[in-house]
Amino acid sequence: MGKIIGITGGIASGKSTVTNFLRQQGFQVVDADAVVHQLQKPGGRLFEALVQHFGQEIILENGELNRPLLASLIFSNPDEREWSKQIQGEIIREELATLREQLAQTEEIFFMDIPLLFEQDYSDWFAETWLVYVDRDAQVERLMKRDQLSKDEAESRLAAQWPLEKKKDLASQVLDNNGNQNQLLNQVHILLEGGRQDDRD
C-alpha cells in the first residue's frame, strides 16, 4: 500500500506550482478538478446524472453541457443546489476512490490534489495533508492580477471558500507561499526528503 498525501490550498495560493513540481519529480498527482471535468463530458457519469435530472435542455448543439444554464438552474433553487452537491459529491468521491486504489497498488508514494479536501471530509484518506498557504492580502492581490478582477470581485470569490487560516489548523504540513517560488519549492524538497527518510526507517 503506497503512502498517500493530500494537497489543498485556496484560489491563487500557488497549489499548481507545487503539483507541477511534484509531477516533474516523477510523482503521480491525481487532479480532482480534471477528474470532475472528465465526468462532465458527454458520456461521463456526471453528465448522464445531470441530463437525467434536468433534461435535454441543458445540452448544447455540440453535445456539451450548457454550463451557464446549468449554473442558473442549480443556484437559483436551494433544493437543486442540495441535490447537485450530494449527487456530484458521491460520484466524484467514488471516482477518486477508484483512482486511489489503483495507484496504491503501483506507487510507493503519490499525491491527490483536492481543492475542497477539508470541506468535503477527505482528510482520513491521507497519511498527510499539505496545505499551500498564503496570507489573505497576498491571495487577494494575486487573484486580482491573475483573473483581472476588482478587489470586491476577488474578495467575493474568496468568501465562498473556507479561509486558509482555518485550513492551516487542520493540515499536517503547511507550505508557506508568501515568499518566492524557490522558497516554496525548497519547502517541498524538505518534506519529500523527510518522507523518504521515514520510508527507510
Swiss-Prot record:
Disulfide bonds: none annotated. It comes from the Bacteria. Pfam families: CoaE (PF01121). InterPro entries: Depp_CoAkinase, P-loop_NTPase. It catalyses: 3'-dephospho-CoA + ATP = ADP + CoA + H(+). One of its GO terms (molecular function) is dephospho-CoA kinase activity. ATP binds at A12, S13, G14, K15, S16, T17. Its main location: cytoplasm. Its EC number is 2.7.1.24. Pathway: Cofactor biosynthesis; coenzyme A biosynthesis; CoA from (R)-pantothenate: step 5/5. It is found in: Cytoplasm. GO terms for biological process: coenzyme A biosynthetic process. Residues 4-201 form the DPCK domain. Catalyzes the phosphorylation of the 3'-hydroxyl group of dephosphocoenzyme A to form coenzyme A. Belongs to the CoaE family. This is Dephospho-CoA kinase. It comes from Streptococcus pneumoniae serotype 4 (strain ATCC BAA-334 / TIGR4). The lineage of its organism: Bacteria, Bacillati, Bacillota, Bacilli, Lactobacillales.
